[in-house]
A protein has these predicted regions:
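N-terminal phosphate-binding caps/lids of nucleotide- and nucleic-acid-binding domains
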Residues: 1-203
Length: 203
């Protein structure tokens, strides 16, 4: 969570964070309910961090009514988690919805992350690329021309470790594939762009 995101969520829900670092004998558990600290202390815990959010906007009905249907919100969260897995492919993620495991990544690199998110068939239809120009490195996977999709949902761009949406990159890749695509088809890719930090505005 970046900046004030986690405390903002904790101010309108019940949040439980359990974390243990490598080398620590015990983990730490922190529970906040609508901004009020309920519990803070040591506990036995596996390595890593889990964040549980419950009763979002339960005490603010005016905000809660603006939430979309449960499935819509779930799909939006699942989409974001999938991008986190791809962006941080050396970190393992376990994502569950209603006690059902949706993603369980191994943290074993790009190919493993792609297979976790999209499946083995997807990975087998991708072409690995790598290009370096001065201080700029572009690498990742693009689809074989025969493996296009009917939406842009399978396009992922990671810039300096962050998932970003960029229409210019999407349009450029589309231009390269256009002559191979049927109507309303789009290329699919997982691209990692690393460049000097002063080249981009993280906001």
């Amino acid at each position: 969570f970046r900046g004030e995101a986690l405390p903002s969520i904790a101010s309108v829900s019940k949040v439980t964070v359990v974390t243990r670092r490598n080398g620590d004998d015990f983990g730490t558990r922190y529970v906040v309910d609508n901004g009020n600290e309920l519990d803070f202390g040591e506990m036995g815990a596996p390595l890593g961090t889990s964040v549980t959010v419950e009763n979002l906007f339960e005490r603010i009905p005016a905000r809660k009514k603006f939430l979309s249907k449960e499935l819509t919100e779930e799909n939006a969260i699942t989409n974001l988690i999938s991008r986190f897995i791809l962006a941080n492919n050396k970190v393992s993620f376990k994502y569950t919805v209603n006690d059902k495991i949706v993603f369980n990544s191994l943290g074993e690199g790009t190919k493993s992350a792609i297979e976790t998110v999209y499946g083995r068939d997807y990975l087998s239809n991708m072409i690995e690329i790598h290009s370096t120009m001065s201080d700029i490195v572009l690498q990742g996977f693009v689809n074989k021309p025969s493996f296009s999709k009917h939406s842009k949902a399978f396009q992922t761009l990671i810039v300096n470790g962050r998932y970003v949406l960029n229409d210019d990159i999407s349009y450029t890749v589309y231009g390269c594939y256009q002559k191979y695509l049927m109507t309303r088809q789009y290329p699919t890719y997982v691209l990692y762009l690393d460049l000097p930090y002063d080249f981009v505005d993280v906001n």
